[in-house]
Amino acid sequence: DAAAMKVADIGISVDTAVDVAKESADIILLEKDLMVLESGIIEGRKTFANMIKYIKMTASSNFGNMFSVLGASALLPFLPMESMHLILLNLIYDSCCSAIPWDNVDEEFIKLPKKWDASSIGKFMVWIGPTGSFVHFASFAFMYFVFCPHFVSHGVTYNNLASHFTGDKLNMIRASYVAMFQTGWFVESMWSQSLVIHMIRTVKLPFIQSRASAQLTLLNFFGIIFITIIPFTLLGKVLGFSSLPLSFFLFLLPCVLAYMILVTAVKKAYIHYHK
């Protein structure tokens, strides 16, 4: 047995076997039950699946956000979000993602072994990342041309403020305009990033055919609530945020819903193209 176990891909023995057999084995069973191996294989495949989920989610999200920040910085006369805002956003988002190791895994994924494919991460990132940027740019346009002018500057866009206001009032309106814009994108980013996790985590139809674990769902929910209330708190004032009017959420809800539908469609196209 020892000779055969040495040349085998995986040698299996029990703890009551002779020493030479146990030394040759890769796995030593504490019980005489091979079902332990099945459980270990299933848990290993679940761990691999959730690891891939997190890597793809984070890579595509960061790529999309980076593209959005670069584009907005080139097009807008001010920064779309301060560095401290980005750090706080990523900190809370990553905290929400900490429940991914306990997420549910589709049974179809664990039926057969999967291989590590680093190239698939780049492909997925290129497909999903720009999808998020497209929605972000649509949000930028809405907040810059419609939302902020309506609630801050009496219908005047940022570039035209100097022709309508002067002195301290001009500076005050500019600061309020930027704060309102940055706050809107800060909240919209957390909503979209957190909810799109449910679109990316499965190849099935999310919420209907496949549901996330309770841990992941609850952390997502609390993360969204926490980010949403920050602008209304003292911490929000310290960070330079502005209190959002309730009408902002009338825009946010359909925007995030459209983003979720769009990501699901792009994901289906990606799976069809790369299967």
Regions found by a protein language model. Name each.
Residues 1-8:
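Acidic, divalent-metal-coordinating active-site segment for phosphoryl/phosphodiester hydrolysis
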Residues 3, 78, 131, 232-235, ...:
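Hydrophobic residues in alpha-helical membrane-spanning segments
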Residues 8, 13-205:
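Membrane-embedded transport module
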Residues 90, 146-167, 171, 176-275:
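C-terminal transmembrane module of polytopic membrane proteins
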